[in-house]
C-alpha cells in the first residue's frame, strides 16, 4: 500500500474542514420574529445581507407579541427577537439575552399619495381623529374624503403619537377611524386607499415606491437630521434581541447590521443608525 506523507494528509484534512465550514455557513438558518413594526427595516437588512452572502438563510416570521417573542428566543425557537417597545432591558439581560439597538425611526402620519397637504398641525391631527375634519379640502387639499386609520392602543406607533401630541392623549377616536391590526395592514391600506391617513414609520414610507408620503408636523419634517437632533419628536427605537452568545450565523448577521454597509441600508430605509 502506498504511504501518504503527513503534509498531504494534513492538507486533505484542512480541505475537508474548510468544505464543512462553508457547507455549515450555507445551511445555517437565522430565524427572526417579533415586532411587525421593526420587520420592514430588518427585511431590508436581510435582503442586503443575502446579496453579499448568497448562501445565507434568514427567515423572518409574521410577528410575535411582546412576551411571546422573548419566550420564543429563550426556548430557542427563534434566533433573534425584533422589538420596539415594552422591552425590559434589565430583565432580558438578567435572563441571559443581549439587546442590540440598531436604529431610531420617525413615527409619521403617512398619507396616500393622492392626498395633497404636506403638513398638519397637532390641532388638525386631533380634529381629524375626532371626526371633526372629514375632507382634505378643509385643509387646503383636494376635494377628497379623509379615511383616518390607526393602530391598536397597545402598539408603539399609537403610544408615541398619544404621548407626544397633547390633544391626542385622552382623545376618543371617532367611529370612522379604522384600526389596522398589524404594521403591514397599515402600509397596504395607506398605499391603496385614496384619502387615507394613518400613523406609520418612515421605513414604510421609503419602501412604498412613492405610494405613501409622510406629512410634516407643525412644519417640521420627519427628516434624518431632524430625528438626529430630536427636533422631530415622534420617534421609536428598533431593537434586536439575541442570546448573550449568539450562534455563528446570527453573529455574522449582527456584524453586518453594525457595519458601514448595514448602516447605509438603515439610512436608505428611513431610519437613523444607532451604535
Set out the residue ranges of the language-model regions:
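Exported/periplasmic ABC-transporter solute-binding proteins
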Residues: 24-275
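Bacterial N-terminal signal peptides that target proteins for export
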Residues: 2-12
